[in-house]
């Protein structure tokens, strides 16, 4: 549970104005609120605790501490006034004392027993100041001094006022009072040159020199990323530098290493990440980092320790040692010059041992307690914490299990005893466990004795004859009233009777006469809603009244989040998370985001783009459509001029054009059409009962839907006709069936008048197919349609090609389209359904158009 403490400068200098007219204190308040919004986007922020400290005299400087909730924090933040001195040192000391208030009681520091990285209380101190001179009642101070006296017991056990899991970050406001005419420089925010910078670096943090609002937003984004669970450690090199590695990956002894020149990676002051356990949410570990002294019972008091342990690493390459059934702790190092140097060596199968000076009794440097090793993928460097002096212990345990089979000889016992003498006494649990194992070796362990339970199945008094049971029955039936004086107060000494909450209204369902006259209508409404909504829980008040919250409490999400149940853990935390690839692969998970207001200004002006409708927008042409039909607005297809039917939406602009789904026909004046034994003459552009056009579009291919066929489809049509065999049958691709026309047609075309028809002179005069062949082809098409609808993706070309090959009249094609729509609805293929419905509308309109033309032709006769 991270602790976020905000230290706000309330000195009089915070009243100075910026070029926007706002004071520094107003900017500080807005920065805190913006940080809370950015932090609330992370689901892990549910356990955050916020504190507020000012530059006032203690104890009045603590505005929100351990006992105050989030609402009090926000109220105190809004009521801050700038009217004091710049007592930064005293304010920092008060902040650290507030954080360390409960550490001695909770046992996190574990003085004299090693440093456990998994015992931590990660804290982030964020101070917002103007960076002016430090002032106090004694005058102006040139340097930052923290008072040494502390009222907390046990503070003398640590040399510094902070701990290794507490980091300080400073936002130093340097905003000008006059707008700058120079263009703003983009890039990283530099550190400030004030006195607080050095204090930030000592704790493992840093300072930010804020000169514009954009830089402030950038700093807040960076601070949100800094909220990590971990501890700060000093890594220092001991011994000579390693030999350089050549291009072939081997040691190059011919290239001398510069051991005397100080390199940045020789000494690093960085964080190691302590990840919480995925099952419990709490960090779990096994081995401590040794103390820098050998504990002795004769010491009058423990020597004070430094806040950050000094861990020395030797650059001698060693083999990483791990055995089965022996746990180890693994911590990732924050990126630093040390991690960069180790990764550049590209040796993931070697490690560098780490030591703590004066941790051993007979060795000044101490014995190794772990090692630094690059990951196998060379992406990070990890610190492995093992048992103390593990190069001696691990071979002994390996021999005990594999060679001696848990029956050690005298030589092994002597070697193990000599190892225990080098072990610090605070490894007590390990030592006691080892002694228990040694004592039980060769002996049969005693059988575990279970808990004895009395058998009440027979021989005892019946439950109904029990005096207390009969008394309880009388109290339930109402014969005797339950008296509170009969309760044994000693048995429930820690229990308290809850006070009546006046905000909760009593339920008035039992007796209708208890309802006040003015509440009869409201009560009747509630009873009716409860009666009709049987699937919900019975509510005693209107749902609208639950949202009647004062404006001052509308943004208080923290108290509500604390009441929510914790999210369930992953079933298999070691299994990599499966990416959500359905729909838009670039979609981000919005779960856990909690945003009250639109805060687009966080991204700055560089992320603003024009609206998609503007012509000059670079993003308008690349803007992706929403994948969800429920979220997508209905698009209106562009209206174009149709040379046949006037204005209307073209079919090619809405769904993929498949010209043969409704068969186009070659038409010309004076063309004679023979269909089912009836010969009709097309004159003056009249439409025959079969729906053929004549003069309205001479020498062009006209779609029966009333739209002109695009020119690029004329070639495809000609290819279809030229693929006919000499016997007048079409061989279907991918099958052995032959497909012909469903009707006997004879087209008489004048080659001199129709140039398009003349190009198709090789077309046969008759297309024949039997009804049995058509039925078999349609059954095969229906089976393939079912397969294509079930396929994943949005490639629908094959579906429309199959629909084109359906044999039979127009009513048969309509049935196939309706069948495909039903199949698509089973698998929720909404886009495909939309395309098919458009095709169905075209077929219906064409069928209606044919019927009307047929009636008109008969009436004219």
UniProtKB/Swiss-Prot annotation:
Give residue ranges for domain VWFA: 3-227
What Gene3D superfamilies does the database record attribute to this sequence?
von Willebrand factor, type A domain
Q: Which residues carry this modification: Phosphoserine?
A: 617
Q: Which SUPFAM superfamilies match?
A: vWA-like
Q: Does the keyword DNA-binding apply?
A: no
Q: Name one GO cellular component term.
A: integrator complex
Q: Which residue intervals make up region (Disordered)? A: 605-626
Q: Which GO terms describe its biological process?
A: snRNA 3'-end processing
One Pfam family name is Beta-barrel_INTS6
- What PROSITE patterns does the database record attribute to this sequence? VWFA (PS50234)
Transmembrane recorded as keyword: no
Q: Which UniProt keywords apply?
A: Phosphoprotein
- Top-level taxon of origin: Eukaryota
Protein name per its UniProtKB record: Integrator complex subunit 6-like
